[in-house]
From Swiss-Prot:
Keywords: Membrane, Photosynthesis, Photosystem II, Reaction center, Thylakoid, Transmembrane, Transmembrane helix
Pfam family, one: Ycf9
Main subcellular location: membrane
Description of how the protein assembles with itself and partners: PSII is composed of 1 copy each of membrane proteins PsbA, PsbB, PsbC, PsbD, PsbE, PsbF, PsbH, PsbI, PsbJ, PsbK, PsbL, PsbM, PsbT, PsbX, PsbY, PsbZ, Psb30/Ycf12, peripheral proteins PsbO, CyanoQ (PsbQ), PsbU, PsbV and a large number of cofactors. It forms dimeric complexes.
Any single GO CC term annotated in Swiss-Prot or TrEMBL for this entry: photosystem II reaction center
Entry annotated with the keyword rRNA processing: no
Membrane topology label: Multi-pass membrane protein
Gene Ontology BP term (one): photosystem II stabilization
Summary of the function given for this chain in its UniProt record: May control the interaction of photosystem II (PSII) cores with the light-harvesting antenna, regulates electron flow through the 2 photosystem reaction centers. PSII is a light-driven water plastoquinone oxidoreductase, using light energy to abstract electrons from H(2)O, generating a proton gradient subsequently used for ATP formation.
Chain segments annotated as transmembrane: 8-28, 41-61
Organism field: Synechococcus sp. (strain JA-3-3Ab)
Listed name of the protein: Photosystem II reaction center protein Z
Assigned protein family: Belongs to the PsbZ family.
Keyword match Transmembrane helix: yes
Length: 61
């Protein structure tokens, strides 16, 4: 169970770093705002689910 927690935490950290770069780039590109808005929304929701998942795994480790 500890290995699953560590892998999930690593994925969360890497995904967070990806969002730190991707969100400002998507905000600055005004060419297709509706598509960028959907990508940011889905990415944020996925991040929240990952945080909750890591929290649950942390509880059971």
């Amino acid at each position: 169970m500890m290995l699953i927690f560590q892998i999930a935490l690593l994925v969360l950290v890497l995904y967070s770093l990806l969002l730190v770069v991707a969100v400002p780039v998507l905000f600055s590109s005004a060419s297709d705002w509706s598509r960028a808005k959907n990508v940011i929304l889905v990415g944020s929701l996925l991040w929240v689910l990952m945080v909750i998942g890591v929290g649950v795994l942390s509880f059971f480790k």
